[in-house]
Amino acid sequence: RFIYFDELQKKIKKLPIKKLSIIPVIDRNTKRLIDVIDSEKLNLLDVRKKKQKLNVSVIIMAGGKGTRLLPYTSVLPKPLLPVNRKPTINHIIDRFGNYNVKNFFVTLNYKSEILKTYLKDLSKIRTIKTIEEKKPLGTAGSLFLIKNKIKNDFFLTNCDTIINENYNDMYKHHKTEKNDVTVVTARKKFKIPYGVCDVKENGFQMKEKPELKYYVNTGYYILSKNCLSVLKKLEYLDFNNFLLKCKKYKKKIGILKHLNNFLKVYNIRY
């Protein structure tokens, strides 16, 4: 018994919490294991509760070339590559749409005309504004073009990340912690397939195939509107350097350790 990733939100609601042991979550295309759901995680996902309206905007960074997905991105921009027969950007917009989020901004550069044509149809349902970079601005530089258009707090996401979580809970964490920027992380395990030698002044130690655990950046962020004040000019700016600017101006940066229930598009084999 298992659940396909694209059916997770729909089918998980019907799972009996008390009788649930372990349910694998499988990618439909590759048939690979993505996650495992148990009763504790099902409770944490909180998908049974009625979703409340989320009063935020969403910025989707869609200007990159998607070089890790060549040759497919030489034809289509990465946001339009399908995950289980549905463009990645639709997965992102639809998930926020479940929380009645209607205000979206999409930053464009590579193959922008294709994306603008596609998003024009989606704009009939939700308010989707496109912001075109005349030259690549990095993962945070285009925020300068939007800073005067944003009226409230917002989620910022890469266009290649799909997260199945309760966005209300994520935003509540951001507000409770009084963060200006919340970086959404996931716990990942990396097993080194070799013995690792540790040489120190007091001796030698070897660990056989150690497993390392880290909290990694998912590419999802929650930001308060006030943090955009650190952007003084239009420039190329990676998100790491944006965080350094936030620290310089005494903005509070925190992390959200989430359930690892996310998918990166570049992990998919077509």
Outline where the language-model segments fall.
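Short beta->alpha linker loops
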Residues: 3, 7, 21, 29, ...
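Short loop/turn microsegments at loop-to-beta-strand junctions
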Residues: 20-23, 194, 218
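Short hydrophobic beta-strand motif reused across regulatory alpha/beta modules
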Residues: 34-42
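N-terminal glycine-rich phosphate-binding loop and ensuing alpha1 helix
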Residues: 51-115
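Catalytic-core segments of class I nucleotidyltransferases/pyrophosphorylases
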Residues: 154-155, 162, 168-175, 188-192, ...
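A short, conserved acidic/glycine-rich loop-to-beta-strand motif
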Residues: 177-187
